[in-house]
Amino acid sequence: MQFSKMHGLGNDFMVVDAVTQNVYFSPELIRRLADRHLGVGFDQLLVVEPPYDPELDFHYRIFNADGSEVAQCGNGARCFARFVRLKGLTNKRDIRVSTQTGRMVLSVTDDDLVCVNMGEPNFDPQTVPFRATKEEKTYIMRAAEHTVLCGVVSMGNPHCVLQVDDVKTAKVELLGPVLEGHERFPERANIGFMQIVSREHIKLRVYERGAGETQACGSGACAAVAVGIQQELLSEEVHVELPGGSLHIRWKGPGSPLFMTGPATHVYDGFIHL
């Protein structure tokens, strides 16, 4: 099986073309491939499939390192767009894809950045899903004997965003896994720790569902900005500084889609016998 290794700001992926190859990934195989000592090693596996709708170009599937399939990965979406052009699967600059839960448009810019229309953030607890009696801008939660205030949003996948004074000293290792598997998140969640530098600049660390803390999380950056704008703490355009690099997020507010722009890097191509 041929594959490519790619990353978006250090969030690394194994990308596989299932348009021209016949492939099947069991959870066990994905876990074996994800092992950084015994396999290829990655945060997520991205699979390019033929479209289910003639109006679309591809179907985009995402699997975490633990073998679970998820509906959204923003950094992966940028790498997906770069991959299909590099491999000659399309020469379009605006690439329309379906995911497990919806549709996306991935646009490759002249300077080889990728702008992703992530759709409109959804704060409805039932959609996230998040157990709450009504929609709030801020929720109070108990985790690891701490009381935390957080915002909750779906970017096609569930996110919980906490505001912290300093991302360097944030209790990511303590609170991340506890909140990820909290009973109020029936499908688990990605946990963002956001430090607001100014209305146009935040620093962010993300503990990803099924992967742990990563160098960058695109949908997590989108979620943090969406929550910050909802809470009237951030402007419409925000520079998001992650451990692996920076993203530009733009959202005009309710009724509008959110856009994420950033790089996608091809590292190497490989072949593995399964």
UniProtKB/Swiss-Prot annotation:
Substrate binds at N11, Q44, N64, G74, N75, N157, N190, E208, R209, G218, S219. GO terms for molecular function: diaminopimelate epimerase activity. The record marks Y268 as: Important for dimerization. Its main location: cytoplasm. The keyword Amino-acid biosynthesis applies. InterPro entries: DAP_epimerase_AS (IPR018510), DAP_epimerase_DapF (IPR001653). Its EC number is 5.1.1.7. Keywords: Amino-acid biosynthesis, Cytoplasm, Isomerase, Lysine biosynthesis. The active site is at C73 (proton donor), C217 (proton acceptor). GO terms for biological process: lysine biosynthetic process via diaminopimelate. The record marks H159, E208 as: Could be important to modulate the pK values of the two catalytic cysteine residues. Pathway: Amino-acid biosynthesis; L-lysine biosynthesis via DAP pathway; DL-2,6-diaminopimelate from LL-2,6-diaminopimelate: step 1/1. It is found in: Cytoplasm. One of its GO terms (cellular component) is cytosol. Gene3D superfamilies: Diaminopimelate Epimerase, Chain A, domain 1. It catalyses: (2S,6S)-2,6-diaminopimelate = meso-2,6-diaminopimelate. HAMAP family: DAP_epimerase. Homodimer. Catalyzes the stereoinversion of LL-2,6-diaminopimelate (L,L-DAP) to meso-diaminopimelate (meso-DAP), a precursor of L-lysine and an essential component of the bacterial peptidoglycan. Belongs to the diaminopimelate epimerase family. This is Diaminopimelate epimerase.
